Amino acid sequence: MGIKGLTKFIADAAPNAIKEIKIENLMGRVVAIDASMSLYQFIIAIRDSEQYGNLTNESGETTSHISGLMSRSIKLMENGLKPIYVFDGAPPELKGSELEKRGEKRQKAEELLKKAKEEGNLEEIKKQSGRTVRVTRKQNEEAKKLLTLMGIPVVEAPCEAESQCAFLTKYNLAHATATEDADALVFGTKILIRNLNANASSANQNKNKNSSKRGYILTEINLEQVLKGLNLSMNEFIDFCILCGCDYCDTIKGIGSKTAYNLIKEYNSIEKIIENIDKNKYQVPSNFRFVEARDSFINPKVLPKEEVKIDWCEPKIEELKNFLIKDYNFNEVRVTNYINRLLKARKVTTQRRLDNFFTACTKKSTKLVIEESQSQSKTQKEAKSKRKGKKRDAPNDGAAKLNSKQSKKTKVEKEPKREKKDEEAPNGEAHNGDNNEDEETPGMGARDPFDTDDEEDNPSPNFFHQKSDSESGNVKKEKTEQEGNATTAGDVYNYPNGKDTAGSNTHLSSNSTLHSCNNVGSEKAPNEGMHTVGSSAPEAGTNHVGINHVGTNHVGINHVGTNHVGTNHVGSGDLFPPNVADCANNNADKAQPEMKKKNMLFLLPYCPKNVTNVKKRKSVQRC
């Protein structure tokens, strides 16, 4: 049974719905297989090489179907598939006329076969032998017994095997339907697999020149993509297939797949097509039972989900040996080899199914992977450009736009290596260092985790803390204590010559970090060798301007909004003293050279009378 010309039409009109796959792509999947179609293939393919007759045992009974079914099932399981074989039940009444036509064709083929044997024409014998093949009820029962002894599930459909397979995919009991009949799509199977045979894997892997001619390329057709590509609803697709030609009713003469598609697109249903087409050009059959055919596709006779029993059982080894060796005269060595492969294949199927379960959750489409790769590459390039000193605009604080000038790179003498020294934070926790890089700062860009250019990305140790073992994880931060208490919200970073003390009434937001840096050495700077946190820092809502780090021109971490410049967090609103912008503009380009390599801008809310830069020894006057 099938739909005339459907596969070729889909390949032309909806190419994205059809793709060639490897048998490994079905690893861990449950596949519902049309058993009658498989047996038909085995009986045709496995024949005596001399007279193209069926393989038989000593009693003359055909064994081609048993040999083929056992071999293919083991091969599929070795590749990680879990097959379910579905057998045909009684044929539907609508198919009666089609079965009569098939009987007439078979009778004619038998006459031609007899004539070819008399003439000794081997080519004609081979051709007509395939046309006379018929799967008997006895062969079906033998196949069911073999599968049961192998521990493979068997489902007996009340009517058509294709429709039952399709509904197993609808019940989510199977991933796909494996059959050569395209009408499984019309019954609603989600995925249709064609050419699922023991040679498919080798054809896909080796791609030898004869594989495609022999039809060994494994093909997958996706129903959702078919409907999307054809731009049809499911009901329109069913009517389109009926017009193309099915086994349930006759067709309108003169209408092929292309004409049928155009008519469905224009009129949407067979009823409207019959009303509007030219009756002289297109001959509608007098007994055109398209309504019944449509109902057979939409509401086929199938087992409901609760009545479907799929049992994966352990193989019955002794009974299987007796069935093959005693009843059908299979070679004992060959049978032993098959059984050993079967037992190993069952383990492979279980293991690969579990692997597939875990990997399926993280699998990404090719398109998504490409987009992420391009985005990541773009981010890396932008980050490197910023680190190399390209001009950037500082965020606007609401009063004036802050700009930093590019200065020439100057060589800086290396500072003496700092000693590792732990100091206890105000909250009782000691931290040797943390970059506090939990969030990206728009002002300076995120650190590229994939970049290994240490010379560019690691400035002089005079300006950044030494890293400790704790930097590999997130450092725990406590919330700010009540206003008026000493600063407890930030982390303290230890430097060899610096020491931090917190003044009274100093307020930090919960994200603030107190950086202790090397002493600058200004004569008039208070507490030489130490940095103090100014008291009574002005407040703006919950945003606080306080900590003046004179040593390295750090403006005490101002968390306002989400905009950040360097390590100074600047947001919107007039939240700084009037002299902040002027001070920043006057002194921005006098920042230390190593910091300017990173294109950082530092703001000084309170300018000391005389502050001397580390290397240039130039004074910065009060704003």
Curated annotation (Swiss-Prot):
Gene3D superfamilies associated with the record: 5' to 3' exonuclease, C-terminal subdomain, 5'-nuclease
Post-translational events: Phosphorylated. Phosphorylation upon DNA damage induces relocalization to the nuclear plasma.
Annotated region described as I-domain, given as residue ranges: 124-267
KW DNA repair (keyword) present: yes
Main location: nucleus
Gene Ontology cellular-component terms listed: mitochondrion; nucleolus; nucleoplasm
Binding-site residues, Mg(2+) 2: 181, 183, 247
Polar residues bias: start-end ranges: 502-517
Compartment(s): Nucleus, Nucleolus; Nucleus, Nucleoplasm; Mitochondrion
Textual note on the cofactor: Binds 2 magnesium ions per subunit. They probably participate in the reaction catalyzed by the enzyme. May bind an additional third magnesium ion after substrate binding.
PROSITE patterns: XPG_1, XPG_2
Biological role stated in the UniProt entry: Structure-specific nuclease with 5'-flap endonuclease and 5'-3' exonuclease activities involved in DNA replication and repair. During DNA replication, cleaves the 5'-overhanging flap structure that is generated by displacement synthesis when DNA polymerase encounters the 5'-end of a downstream Okazaki fragment. It enters the flap from the 5'-end and then tracks to cleave the flap base, leaving a nick for ligation. Also involved in the long patch base excision repair (LP-BER) pathway, by cleaving within the apurinic/apyrimidinic (AP) site-terminated flap.
Official protein name in the record: Flap endonuclease 1
Organism of origin: Plasmodium vivax (strain Salvador I)
Underlying gene: FEN1
